[in-house]
Swiss-Prot record:
GO terms for cellular component: COPII vesicle coat; endoplasmic reticulum membrane; nuclear pore outer ring. WD repeats lie at residues 7-46, 51-92, 97-138, 160-200, 207-249, 257-296. Its main location: membrane. Component of the coat protein complex II (COPII) which promotes the formation of transport vesicles from the endoplasmic reticulum (ER). The coat has two main functions, the physical deformation of the endoplasmic reticulum membrane into vesicles and the selection of cargo molecules. It also functions as a component of the nuclear pore complex (NPC). NPC components, collectively referred to as nucleoporins (NUPs), can play the role of both NPC structural components and of docking or interaction partners for transiently associated nuclear transport factors. This is Protein transport protein SEC13. Pfam families: WD40 (PF00400).
């Protein structure tokens, strides 16, 4: 375990390793993003990225096929894109379509290209495509009327669609979906519609009695899809869908409430373990048993 002391002068809100686990990006209320090189149990500060004018809530690494690229989002309403070339970091783009704090960002599955999803307190969610000529093409959606707190892509999937040609064969098409959570206590699922050239609301999931703080779509591509949502109401709901046509089934992770607000949810890479971050400074692990019940699988300690 690597421990970095005094990394920032104020509260740290996010810390994310890159694809290879060699670089660590952190962000803070001190308005900065910091990049560390990590080797074994040692670390070295490489650069401090300055450009935001408010607390920086989240960072996310792009897939390495696009280069060494990092996105950051802030209370200042901006999403900044940073790139490292020959050991030097610089800001290469700014996404400034939101009128309030941008609370969450996530790069799409790399199969979709350089697409970035952002959720804002202005109630809107944006998907911005970064094109090779340096221009951007944003899609802006009215998602949650009193604020969008979080957004997460579904794993990349293909859907068979009938070919209009004479062969009558089927050609697989990308199915781009993401989930959002808002201050309206709702979880919403959105799907790209090529005819409308935007993302349309597919499902609205009701179950929380307070702000939805985080949503996480399991990375496992199986016949059943899993979503986790956590809330200010101190509950975690697991949502499952057995096929693309079915409705989503709601299951409380546990009957009694957690001791404090649940802030973050994160699936393991294999999708079988769910980690939950609670306001009482604990991180608990959960897994589904053979009967479909969720049970504790441990606790993360220092």
């Amino acid at each position: 375990m690597v421990t970095i002391n005094n990394a920032h002068s104020e509260l740290i809100h996010d810390a994310v390793l890159d694809y290879y686990g060699k670089r660590l990006a952190t962000c803070s209320s001190d308005h900065t993003v910091k990049i560390f090189e990590v080797e074994g149990e040692t670390h070295k500060l490489v650069d401090t990225l300055q450009g935001h004018e408010g607390p920086v809530w989240q960072v996310d690494w792009a897939h390495p096929k696009f280069g060494v690229i990092l996105a950051s989002c802030s209370y200042d309403g901006k999403v900044l894109i940073w790139k490292e070339v020959n050991g030097r970091w610089s800001q290469i783009a700014a996404h400034e379509v939101h009128s309030a704090s941008v609370n969450s960002i996530q790069w799409a599955p790399h199969e979709y290209g350089p697409l970035l999803l952002a959720a804002s307190s202005d109630g809107k969610v944006s998907v911005v495509e970064f094109k090779e000529n340096g221009t951007t093409s944003p899609i802006i959606i009215d998602a949650h009327s009193i604020g969008a707190n979080t957004a997460c892509w579904a794993p990349a999937t293909l859907q068979q669609q009938s070919n209009q040609g004479t062969s009558g064969s089927a050609s697989p098409q990308q199915v781009r979906r993401f989930v959002t959570g808002g201050a309206d206590n709702l979880v919403k699922i959105w799907k790209y519609n090529s005819d409308a050239a935007t993302y349309l609301l597919e499902h609205t999931l009701e179950g929380h009695s307070d702000w939805v703080r985080d949503v996480a779509w399991s990375p496992t591509v199986l016949s059943r899809s899993y979503l986790a949502s956590v809330s200010q109401d101190r509950t975690c709901i697991i949502w499952t869908q057995d096929s693309k046509e079915d409705t989503w089934k709601k299951t409380l992770l546990k009957e009694d409430k957690f001791p404090d607000v649940l802030w973050r949810a994160s699936w393991s890479l294999s999708g079988n373990i769910l980690a939950l971050s609670c306001g009482d400074n604990t991180v608990t692990l959960w897994k589904e048993n053979l009967e479909g019940k969720w049970e504790p699988a441990g606790q993360v300690t220092e």
